[in-house]
Swiss-Prot record:
Belongs to the complex I NDUFA13 subunit family. The chain crosses the membrane at residues 43-65. It comes from the Eukaryota. Accessory subunit of the mitochondrial membrane respiratory chain NADH dehydrogenase (Complex I), that is believed not to be involved in catalysis. Complex I functions in the transfer of electrons from NADH to the respiratory chain. The immediate electron acceptor for the enzyme is believed to be ubiquinone. It is found in: Mitochondrion inner membrane. GO terms for cellular component: endoplasmic reticulum; mitochondrial inner membrane; mitochondrial membrane; mitochondrion; respiratory chain complex I. The lineage of its organism: Eukaryota, Viridiplantae, Streptophyta, Embryophyta, Tracheophyta. GO terms for biological process: photorespiration. The keyword Oxidoreductase does not apply. Keywords: Electron transport, Membrane, Mitochondrion, Mitochondrion inner membrane, Respiratory chain, Transmembrane, Transmembrane helix, Transport. This is NADH dehydrogenase [ubiquinone] 1 alpha subcomplex subunit 13-B. Pfam families: GRIM-19 (PF06212). It is a single-pass membrane protein. Complex I is composed of at least 49 different subunits.
Length: 143
């Protein structure tokens, strides 16, 4: 199909038949283009920025110091509470150990009753130095 049939107008025979429309500059020409670097002369000065940042940093460090004081006080309170109850816990552990040690000595006496010359509770290593007893055997609830 030709343009004449679609648009109901006669088509162009040549490009030369086209109307001459061309874009151009406006009358008087275009405004000059500014291509130089644009440095703003508004806004805070370098000194104002420096002082603001320094103040914010100083305030932040002050807050860190206050947090350290609070954390140190809480830690000291926790340690003081532990130091306060430590003698009670140690007394309970000593009492438990003595009762378990008595049971252990009774068991040892029962097991070794047929061995001549066996002394119940005597150290078998005879190193001459005092060593704390191996409490692993006396703590079946832990192991």
């Amino acid at each position: 199909m030709t343009e004449a049939m679609i648009r109901k107008k006669p088509g162009m025979a040549s490009v030369k038949d086209m109307p001459l429309l061309q874009d151009g500059p406006p009358p008087g020409g275009f405004a000059p283009v500014r291509y130089a670097r644009r440095i703003s002369n508004t806004g805070p000065s370098a000194m104002a920025i420096f002082l603001t940042v320094s103040g914010a940093f100083a305030w932040g460090m002050y807050q860190v110091g206050q947090g350290n004081k609070i954390r140190r006080a809480l830690k000291e309170e926790k340690y003081a509470a532990r130091r306060a109850i430590l003698p009670i816990l140690q007394a309970e552990e000593d009492e438990r150990f003595v009762s378990e040690w008595k049971k252990y000595l009774e068991y040892e006496a029962d097991v070794m009753k047929d061995v001549p010359g066996w002394k119940v509770g005597e150290n078998v290593y005879n190193s001459g130095r005092w060593m704390p007893p191996a409490t692993g055997e006396l703590r079946p609830d832990v192991w």
